[in-house]
Amino acid sequence: MPRSSDQTRPVILQAAYKLFRRRGFFRVGMDEIATAAGVTKKTLYYHFDSKDALLTAVLASQHERAFAEFQTYGIDLSGGAEQLIDKLFAGLATWSAKPRWAGSGFTRLAIELADLSGHPARSMAREHKTLMERQLATLLAEAQVPSPAERARELFLLVEGAMVMILVHGDRNYCTAAAAAAKKLVVGVPAA
């Protein structure tokens, strides 16, 4: 039985996401995405008029999921900034332990498209990172951390750096080191 248009779009997005994440944007073709989604190429182009449009839609979908999850980090801040930092880096350690983890797809994509500054996916990646940093600043403000926007930028650098080092070395202990540095930076807690 054929799927409805409402059911087809999410299937295409998920298939494209998996392929882009696993192999990168340039190494995946529309034929392969159509096959993975179980649709014809005509159906794929009915929903997305180009590979660039599909990639932008994939990123928008992933942003919604990641941002919604990240917003839950601030539900209970009774432990203050230290608890927030623990949760942030424990989340990164858990995420990086998943099979086939390859870091932030947004970061990887920005690198892959580095020479295409006007590409809509680069704009989407920039918007995602900006909104995540702002949300972190909001959480730090709620935890009564002074200069929350400045601290959020510094923490975000630690998170991104930890992701890169985990990818390079395959060692999740970089999360522990980044968390210790974050605590020194934000709450003045000496490393354990």
Describe the function of each predicted region.
Residues 57, 71-99, 152-155:
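Hydrophobic alpha-helical connector segments
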Residues 37-48:
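Short hydrophobic/aromatic patch on the recognition helix
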Residues 97-119:
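Amphipathic alpha-helical segments used for helix-helix packing
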Residues 118-127, 141-192:
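Hydrophobic/aromatic-rich alpha-helical bundle segments in the mid-to-C-terminal region
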Residues 1-23, 27-36, 52-56:
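Basic, helix-initiating cap at the start of DNA-binding domains
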Residues 5, 13, 59, 63, ...:
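Amphipathic, non-transmembrane alpha-helical scaffold segments
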Residues 55-62, 69:
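Alpha-helical DNA-contacting segments of helix-turn-helix folds
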